[in-house]
Amino acid sequence: MPELPEVEVTRLSFAERIAGARIEAVLVGKPLRWPLGCETQQLQGQRVLAVRRRGKYLLLDLSEGLLLMHLGMSGSVSFGLNLPVTGKHDHFDMVTSLGTLRLHDPRRFGAVVYASGEDDAVAKKLLGRLGVEPLSDAFDALVFHQWLKGRKTAIKPLLLAGQAVVGVGNIYASEALFLAGIRPTTKASLISKPRAARLHRAIQDVLTNAVAKGGSTLRDFSNADGEAGHFQLDAMVYDRAGLPCRVCAAPIKSIRQGQRSSFYCATCQKP
């Protein structure tokens, strides 16, 4: 599933090129997770003012309203002047004066939704409960620690839930916990203030590094230019069960938490 770094990498790969483009046509294929929410003709003639990101959503600011795009489990975006003929898994094309923006989504858990603004009920429903942005000043270490103190849940699933901080997916939660020296099974309420500060910093460092490396291509992710990510190649623990820890050489362990795999080093990461 594309997480925050993949969505940010996607945004960076086409945001400047589409800014100012006039929408000429919108073509919708098979139904996605949610309906578009407007007639395609309503979008024609509008201009794309900017592309932002909130959590794992791309927000395309239009001259009237905005489009919220989610990549779902397997989605990716392409943008260009000469895209191939629409394929089986291409479900949304927005043809503009500067190129075509296309959503490719084999599993169709993604979506493109129109809202009249961020105060629109549709936008509030999708964005209203998201945690703070981890790469923004709003992600405060002291507030983060206070939030953890009131939770007795294991820290790894808590990070994935996205209520305290948004966009920390499975690979990035595993890597951040390793960097902070905290086991994924540690109860959040038991994490001390200094350890919470280390985890806060680790989350930011891991996500920043992931964006710089183009995200992670675990299956089929690519940015709007078709380029794969490389963060996964340097992972310290993720998907390395049984392999030696890159720091201490102890074998990396793997456990199931909920329906997700967690990877950790029992030597470097303490309960």
Swiss-Prot record:
Quote the EC number. Answer: 3.2.2.23, 4.2.99.18
Q: Which InterPro entries has this protein been placed in?
A: DNA_glyclase/AP_lyase_DNA-bd, DNA_glyclase_Znf_dom_DNA_BS, Formamido-pyr_DNA_Glyclase, FPG_cat, MutM-like_N-ter, Ribosomal_uS13-like_H2TH, Znf_DNA_glyclase/AP_lyase, Znf_FPG/IleRS
Q: How is the cofactor bound?
A: Binds 1 zinc ion per subunit.
Zinc finger (FPG-type) positions are: 236-270
Catalytic activity, reaction form: Hydrolysis of DNA containing ring-opened 7-methylguanine residues, releasing 2,6-diamino-4-hydroxy-5-(N-methyl)formamidopyrimidine; 2'-deoxyribonucleotide-(2'-deoxyribose 5'-phosphate)-2'-deoxyribonucleotide-DNA = a 3'-end 2'-deoxyribonucleotide-(2,3-dehydro-2,3-deoxyribose 5'-phosphate)-DNA + a 5'-end 5'-phospho-2'-deoxyribonucleoside-DNA + H(+)
- Any transmembrane segments, and where? none
- PROSITE patterns per UniProt: FPG_CAT, ZF_FPG_1, ZF_FPG_2
List S-S links within the chain.
none
* Listed Pfam families: Fapy_DNA_glyco, H2TH, zf-FPG_IleRS
Q: Which residues form a coiled coil?
A: none
Specify which residues bind DNA according to the UniProt entry for this protein. 89, 107, 151
UniProt-listed GO biological process terms:
base-excision repair
Question: How does the annotation summarize its subunit structure?
Answer: Monomer.
PANTHER family attached to this UniProt entry: FORMAMIDOPYRIMIDINE-DNA GLYCOSYLASE (PTHR22993:SF9)
NCBIfam families annotated for this entry? fpg, PRK01103.1
HAMAP family hit by this protein: Fapy_DNA_glycosyl
- Protein name, UniProt field: Formamidopyrimidine-DNA glycosylase
Query: Origin organism of this chain?
Result: Polaromonas naphthalenivorans (strain CJ2)
